[in-house]
Amino acid sequence: MRSKHKKFFYTLLFLFFSCLAFGQSTNYVPEDRVAADFTRLLDRPRVAFDGSFQSTKTDSVIIETGFIYSEKDEQVPMLIYKPVTGAKSFPVVIFLHGTGGSKDNEGIINILYQLTRRGIMGVAVDARYHGARIPGGAHASQEYAAAIIKSWSNKDPAHQKHPFFFDTVYDLWRVTDYLITRSDVQADRIGMGGISMGGIETWMAASVDKRIKVVVLDIAAQSFKWSLENNAWQGRVNTIKDAHLLAAKDMGDTAINQQNVKAFWGKLIPGITDEFDCPSMIRLISPRPLLILSTEKDQNCPLPGAKIAYASALESYNLKNAENKLKMDIAPNQPHRSTPEHQQMMLEWFSKWL
């Protein structure tokens, strides 16, 4: 018992000095309120899935392509890789691409295939304004940025859309709703992971959705608050630079700066530097297995912010005696990229805990 108390003390000490070093308070909004507020913010009318899928069988995998509806006019294109075995149902991992990517990227397809080799069904979807969600196919992140610009320009708060992360998070909840209706899915064994934007959408979606049992964040853990307050917002801003430039111009500025970035985030991803920031929301994932994969020189998700998020998670996991279910790995001297070593660790994490 004494060793357990000692371990908890050192955890709190680690949390305190991590946040102190990076200048961030640990006075987070209570977890239950975060979950309720985020769910309320994203809530919208439910519609029937009206799913349609086509199946192709090879020697090594069954591939399903199709879609479901998450909203009245929102098709969610899906790609499903299923093991070719005698099993009738499988654990599932939903895996998400980054900004400008799609479910059909070679790297995403390889992850789905590697999951099937471990007896896991792999599911990928196109985020809003990506991939097949644009007629004829998206042009990298061009349509995504255009949708964000349109949302920024909206003057009617009652009809404010949130294409920057939040709307895709809602889609992920509906994809999970759909998956648990399938007879070939083990509903109590669903995992979720993603790279960059997809990883951000993962910690947002999985934090409040307890049906997601295992989580992996690849170059996605961060603190928007820390980035904003420490002049480290440029990498994240540059992923949709045109949208930020327009917002800056609308506010009378000739260049993107801290204040117009704060206003931009405040309208399009409200709460992102407070209760919906990663260090706050990541606590809600405990005690479920969580793997955080970061890189030392990540300009989009700066490492100091990722360490603040990890420290926050560590406190929550220790309070629930689940510290063995939390792990962080940092790839040295690497920029904002998913490394082969981290992808292997991700696959092993899902195999171990799912």
Where are these regions (language model features)?
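Primarily recognizes the serine-hydrolase "nucleophile elbow" in alpha/beta-hydrolase
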Residues: 173-242, 271-273
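Short beta-strand/loop motif that positions the catalytic acidic residue
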Residues: 292-294
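Short beta-strand element of the alpha/beta-hydrolase
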Residues: 78, 89-98
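Acidic catalytic loop of the alpha/beta-hydrolase fold
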Residues: 297-301, 335-337
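N-terminal cap/lid segment of alpha/beta-hydrolase-fold proteins
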Residues: 43-87
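C-terminal catalytic histidine-bearing segment of alpha/beta-hydrolase fold enzymes
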Residues: 247, 310-354
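Mobile cap/lid helix-loop segments that gate and shape the active-site cleft of serine hydrolases
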Residues: 214-281, 302, 306-310, 318-323
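Cap/lid segment of the alpha/beta-hydrolase catalytic domain
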Residues: 99-170, 226-231
